[in-house]
């Protein structure tokens, strides 16, 4: 039987008077299992970058898990994300859940000079990212040739101390199939 976790989405707002780290500390005090931070490059108000904010939250808390909700795969190279995840998980004492998604805000792709992704690209990219992450986390060297991403004898060292859970933010039959086959939630 699966465990049921309760979490709180912490706003990544950088507007004056906001304090996402204080919000995360309060969630921990209240007994929440995780805090999540959404991943958008810009919005209607000033915002912190997700990965940096999660690192800050992990350093300021001691028990609560941290989750990018969800890290848009097309914004970052999956092998680099796997290394970032291993590092944050290790430094936080094993509290990372890696949330991944295909990215849906096409205006963010354009605004930041990222190549546009079709729905097929977004689903394929999530699947390839999971295969790459799990490969570099478990193999001494990992080579992968996908439709969108590749690695050549990539190494992530040290290896994760435990299996890092991967959650996907998806919709649509094909993406839900990837969730069922490869993800932990």
Named regions from a protein language model:
Residues 1-61, 164:
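N-terminal beta1-alpha1-beta2 module of alpha/beta enzyme domains
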Residues 2, 77-182:
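Internal, glycine-rich beta/alpha segment that forms the wall or movable "lid"
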Residues 4-10, 35-37, 65-69, 96-100, ...:
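Hydrophobic faces of well-ordered beta-strands that scaffold small-molecule active sites
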Residues 14, 41, 74, 104-106:
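Feature marks short, surface-exposed loop/turn motifs that line or immediately flank catalytic pockets
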Residues 25-29, 54-63, 85, 89-96, ...:
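Acidic (Asp/Glu)-rich catalytic clusters
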Residues 44, 68-76:
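Active-site nucleophile and cofactor-binding loops and adjacent substrate-binding regions
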Residues 47-69, 125-132:
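Alpha-helix-loop-beta-strand connector modules within alpha/beta enzyme cores
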């Amino acid at each position: 039987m699966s465990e049921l976790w309760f979490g709180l989405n912490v706003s990544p707002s950088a507007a004056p008077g906001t304090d996402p780290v204080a919000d995360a500390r309060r969630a921990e005090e209240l007994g929440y299992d995780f805090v999540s931070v959404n991943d958008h490059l810009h919005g209607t108000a000033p915002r912190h970058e997700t990965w940096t904010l999660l690192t800050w939250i992990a350093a300021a808390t001691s028990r609560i898990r941290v989750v990018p909700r969800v890290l848009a795969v097309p914004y970052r190279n999956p092998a680099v994300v796997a290394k970032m995840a291993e590092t944050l998980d290790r430094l936080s004492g094993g509290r990372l859940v890696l949330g991944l998604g295909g990215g849906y805000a096409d205006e963010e792709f354009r605004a930041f000079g990222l190549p546009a992704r079709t729905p097929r690209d977004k689903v394929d990219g999530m699947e390839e990212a999971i295969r790459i992450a799990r490969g570099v986390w478990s193999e001494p060297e990992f080579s992968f040739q996908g439709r969108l991403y590749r690695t050549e004898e990539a190494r992530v060292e040290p290896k994760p101390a435990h299996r890092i859970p991967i959650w996907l933010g998806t919709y649509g039959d094909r993406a839900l199939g990837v969730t069922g086959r490869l993800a932990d939630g």
